[in-house]
Amino acid sequence: MHLANEPHVNNMIDGKYEYFSFISYRWEDEKMAKWLQEKLEHYKLPTSLCEQNPDLPTHIRPIFRDKTDLNGHTLEESLMSALESSRYLIVTCSPRATQSEWVNRGIQKFIDLGREKDIIPFIIDGEANADDPKNECFPPALRSLKGERAIYGININDNGRDAAAVKVV
């Protein structure tokens, strides 16, 4: 997200976005999605950063996750509305996520809105653009982004999950 470099973060504060981000995940990865939501919502931006950028929020919230934020509409209506109302889309990527129609639809929705640069792949298992399809963690819509549109993920296996969560910020 790199808040200090985001000129449009003020739009979210001014009411353009209801959610700071939307976490998309496969139900088997729910434990990690819940952990990430809690970690991000409780993360306090450094005081020095907030002092230099007074329009920044001190915390990164709210973050939409279906188990905590769904309302009474149909599942599809609720999810699509929440996606449109979210500044960022965090995709919990794993080989399991590649099998989820809902995860892929959410990614495609952000792409269709012209917001692929606001998608943050959070790799918890597998490998992006893997040679072995069984190890692939990017859903088809993410894999479709090539060249200048390609997105690289944040991998918890590189520095551990806590450091990876901070990289999301």
Model-derived segments and their meaning:
Residues M1-K39, T68-E77, S81-A82, T98-E101, ...:
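C-terminal interaction surface of TIR/SEFIR-family domains
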Residues H42-P62, N129:
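Short mixed-charge
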Residues L89-I90:
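Hydrophobic acceptor-binding patch used for acceptor engagement in glycosyltransferases
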Residues C93:
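Glycine-rich, N-terminal phosphate-binding loop of Rossmann-like dinucleotide-binding domains
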